[in-house]
Amino acid sequence: MLVLTRKLKEAIQIGDDIEVVVLAIDGDQVKLGIRAPKHIDVHRKEIYLAIQAENNAASLASITSLQQLSDQLKKGGKYDER
């Protein structure tokens, strides 16, 4: 992990497209501004992890539903979504 020290209004450049600026420091909180292209998602870590968990749960539900549908079709029956 690269560790950098920055003062108020100083920035860090990541590649050609991403800039992180220290906007404010208040006690133990630091407010950061992030400039990044629109195609790059920027989230707080806890939000990112929640999104990943939801996506994983949704993909598992889809796999289960598809397997149930496949099993029913193999038996010649109709699929019941209940």
Curated annotation (Swiss-Prot):
Q: Which InterPro entries match?
A: CsrA, CsrA_sf
Q: A Pfam family name for this chain?
A: CsrA
Q: Which UniProt keywords apply?
A: Bacterial flagellum biogenesis, Cytoplasm, Repressor, RNA-binding, Translation regulation
Instruction: Indicate where this protein resides in the cell.
Output: Cytoplasm
Gene3D superfamilies xref list = Translational regulator CsrA
Q: Which GO biological process annotations does it have?
A: bacterial-type flagellum organization; mRNA catabolic process; negative regulation of translational initiation; regulation of bacterial-type flagellum assembly; regulation of carbohydrate metabolic process
Q: Which cysteines are joined by disulfide bonds?
A: none
How is this protein annotated for GO cellular component?
cytosol
In which broad location class does this protein mainly occur, judging by the first location in its UniProt entry?
cytoplasm
Enumerate the GO terms in the molecular function aspect.
Answer: mRNA 5'-UTR binding
- What protein family is recorded? Belongs to the CsrA/RsmA family.
* Entry function: A translational regulator that binds mRNA to regulate translation initiation and/or mRNA stability. Usually binds in the 5'-UTR at or near the Shine-Dalgarno sequence preventing ribosome-binding, thus repressing translation. Its main target seems to be the major flagellin gene, while its function is anatagonized by FliW.
Assembly with partners or alone = Homodimer; the beta-strands of each monomer intercalate to form a hydrophobic core, while the alpha-helices form wings that extend away from the core.
Name the record gives this protein:
Translational regulator CsrA
Tell me the organism. Answer: Anoxybacillus flavithermus (strain DSM 21510 / WK1)
Which lineage is the organism of this entry classified under, starting from the top rank?
Answer: Bacteria, Bacillati, Bacillota, Bacilli, Bacillales
